[in-house]
Amino acid sequence: MNASTTVAYRALAAGAAMAMLAVGGPGQTAEATSPAAAPAPAPRIGLALSGGGARGIAHVGVLKVLEELRVPIHCVTGTSMGAIVGGTFASGRAPAEMEKLVLEADWEAIFRDKPPRKEIAVRRKADDYKTLFAPEFGVTEDGLALPKGVIAGVSIEAFFRVLATPAFGIEDFDKLPIPFRALATDIETGDSVVIESGSIAQAMRASMSVPGAIAPVEIDGRLLVDGGIANNLPIDEARKLCADVVIAVNISTPPLKRSELTSALSVAGQLVNFLGKQTVDDQLKRPGDRDVLIAPDL
C-alpha cells in the first residue's frame, strides 16, 4: 500500500469518524434540554463491505485507519471479498495481522486447488500431470456430468479457515467477537441469501464463488454463489443486524478492458461486476440520515 493511498484512507475514515461525532447518539441534539439530562447513548456502528475482487485489500486499509482512530465497530456485513475481509475481522483478527496473512499467501497455490507439494503423499505425486484446476468430469445415468466451476475451491476454503482461526468452533455468527453476516446468491432463484451461522470459512467461500469459475457451495439445501449478484454492498443487512450508523465501503470493480479479459475467472467476474453495480446503485438510493460512504479512489 503506497503512501498516497494510506493518506486517502486516513482522510476518508477520519471524515467518517467526524461525521459520527457530529451526529452523536440517536436522538441527540446540539443543546441538552436539561442540565440533568442523561447523555444519549452512542450510536451502534455497522460496517458494510462490498465485493471488489483483488481490490479487496483496500478494505483492510480502511479497517487499519478506523482502528487507529478508535472508531468502534459493533457488527459487520460483507459480500464476496468484503465477506472475506469482514469475516476475518469479525473472527478477531487485527487488521495488520490480516494484511500480513493476505499479502504473504501463496495465491497461485490457493487457486490451483492443490496443497503444497511437500504435503502430498508420495503415491499421489504421480497425479501431477493432471490439469491445473483438475475439474471433475464423469458420466451418470442422466448423461455427461460437467464440473460446476473450473476451481473446486478446496484450497480456497482451507485458507479461509486459517484466516478465521481465532473463531474456530463458533458456528453462531452472533457469538463471534463482532457479529457478522456474509451475503451470497441462490443460483436457482437469484435471491440474496444472508448466511448467519455454520462454518465461517464456508460462508466466505460461498460469498465469493464466481459462477462458472469457482464451484458453488451448498448450504442448507441451497446452491450458493457470489453474493455480488444479488447484493454487492449490504448496507441494509448491517442496519438489520445492529447499526444506527452504517459505514459502507464500496470498492466495486470497474468494467475490465478487453485486454484484461484473459481467463475464465476474469470473464465470469466481469458479468458479476455488471450485476453487482446495479445492486450497489440500489443500496445507495436508500441511505440512512447518518450513514457514511467510503469509496477509495483505487
Predicted ranges, named:
Residues 2-4, 9-10, 21-79, 87-298:
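Patatin-like phospholipase
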Residues 14-18:
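Hydrophobic helical h-region of N-terminal Sec-dependent signal peptides
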